């Protein structure tokens, strides 16, 4: 049989668009510097002598494919999910690992992806068999890491392999109850001439692994590397075909890690899991609010506590603001962990509706602990931080502010206010500034240790704080 000819093409790592020549910008998605060189086999020409003519004609009504009635398919939770025993991971997964589900776990190098998955294997290996495929380490290296983490090793099977077809054959032979692939960028389909990590290899490897996971109904975790922009390296189609995409985030200079879901077909994408990186591996942080507020400076202006909702979990976070005289023709505005445009909007509201001017001041906003706040319920706390820094008037360490601020200066209601207040009371806060019209829906008896202060407008909240000499 005549071997197919090879040709060089350039493939966009973002959308998969191909081009016979290199271009700085992808003509399909418009991304810059995403066209990567790849080697593919030329497709045979269509026609009388091409593949279409050589393919046998399909007989009408003849197929080996069967369909199952929807009512006959079991959907009970105890049969369709596996609990990992790691509550933070189960929370982000939506209640455990779904049978046949494929999870793509991505993160910066050294953030702890392999550590988490090895601990996951140990957590479920008491009741389920696990197959761990490593393409980056030897089995001895994984063994040393498992010993350091004190992972149960009896029911975990290791294999160091890069050939995807060999891995699929091993999965079909052993039929494990969980498979871990570390990582997809090291996998290779031997019938493709390109090297491992290229767009075609990553795309085809992911498709073949997904096919065997669905066919055997085996849950699978796949590790994916990130590029210099923080996005998952490889074609975007890989994120589309998997069931769940998780990002493992964290500053390597800080001990804790955050697990987020960017996509989840079987649960919410708003949930968040927090872990502490220790010498014995990752440990769950069951009380993130208390951890994030540890070491909070007291009696310092520009600090206030807000409560954000991450899925069904309320988390208290410290917001810091600094307003200082500028040395530049145009004052600087900078944010860390907060939306820049939202900050400018709130500054405009404070100037127009409350009479506090920041036109000749540099303004900086920082969310302590590296948490990214996207919840508009933090608006009121951000405004109080900026005013506190402007007036050099500290906010009480026993006060929390919850509310969305509108363009008219009004303080609007927020969802899950009761849960936020209960969390604040549990941590020890004694006063809460909340939207005034939300007081009608709250029972003060439910919060015996907390005084609720209603504010209809941002000026009311600031006046209440100043009159209370905070």
List where the protein language model places each region:
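Peripheral, non-AAA+ core regions of ATP-driven protein-machinery
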Residues: 4-14, 18-91, 98-106, 111-122, ...
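Conserved RecA-like ASCE P-loop NTPase motor core of nucleic-acid helicases/translocases
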Residues: 130-134
């Amino acid at each position: 049989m005549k071997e197919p000819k090879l040709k060089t093409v350039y493939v966009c790592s973002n959308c998969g668009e191909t081009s016979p020549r290199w271009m700085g910008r992808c003509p399909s998605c418009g991304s810059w510097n995403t066209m990567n060189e790849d080697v593919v086999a030329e497709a045979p020409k269509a026609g009388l002598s091409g593949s279409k003519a050589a393919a046998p004609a399909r007989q009408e009504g003849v197929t080996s494919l069967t369909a199952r009635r929807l009512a006959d398919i079991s959907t009970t939770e105890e049969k369709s999910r596996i609990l990992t025993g790691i509550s933070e991971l189960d929370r982000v997964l939506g209640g455990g690992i779904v049978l046949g589900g494929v999870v793509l776990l991505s993160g910066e190098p050294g953030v702890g992806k392999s550590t988490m998955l090895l601990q996951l294997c140990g957590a479920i290996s008491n009741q389920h068999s696990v197959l761990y495929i490593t393409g980056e380490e030897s089995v001895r290296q994984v063994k040393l890491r498992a010993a350091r983490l004190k992972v149960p090793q009896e029911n975990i099977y290791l294999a160091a392999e890069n050939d995807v077809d060999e891995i699929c054959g091993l999965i079909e032979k052993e039929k494990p109850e969980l498979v871990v692939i570390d990582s997809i960028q090291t996998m290779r389909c031997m019938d493709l001439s390109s090297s491992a990590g290229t767009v075609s290899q990553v795309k085809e490897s992911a498709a073949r692994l997904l096919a065997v996971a669905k066919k055997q109904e085996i849950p699978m975790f796949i590790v994916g590397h990130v590029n210099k922009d923080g996005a998952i390296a490889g074609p975007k189609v890989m994120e589309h075909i998997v069931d769940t995409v998780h990002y493992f985030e964290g500053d390597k200079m800080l001990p804790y890690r955050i697990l987020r879901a960017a996509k989840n077909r079987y649960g919410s994408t708003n949930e968040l899991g927090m872990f502490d990186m220790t010498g014995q591996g990752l440990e769950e942080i069951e009380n993130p609010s208390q951890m994030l507020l540890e070491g909070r400076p007291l009696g310092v202006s520009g600090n206030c506590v807000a409560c954000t909702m991450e899925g069904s979990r309320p988390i208290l976070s410290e917001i810091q603001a600094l307003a200082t005289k500028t040395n530049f023709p145009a004052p600087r505005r900078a944010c860390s962990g907060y939306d820049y445009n939202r900050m400018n909007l709130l500054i405009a509201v404070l100037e127009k509706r409350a009479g506090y001017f920041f036109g000749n001041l540099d303004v900086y906003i920082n969310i302590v602990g590296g948490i990214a706040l996207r919840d508009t319920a933090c608006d009121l706390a951000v405004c109080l931080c900026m005013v506190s820094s402007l007036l050099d008037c500290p906010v009480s360490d026993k006060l929390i502010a919850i509310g969305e601020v509108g363009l008219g200066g009004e303080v609007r209601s927020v969802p899950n206010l009761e849960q936020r207040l209960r969390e604040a009371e549990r941590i020890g806060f004694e006063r809460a500034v909340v939207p005034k019209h939300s007081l009608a829906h709250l029972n003060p008896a439910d919060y015996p240790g907390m005084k609720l202060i209603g504010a209809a407008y941002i000026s009311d909240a600031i006046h209440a704080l100043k009159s209370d000499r905070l």
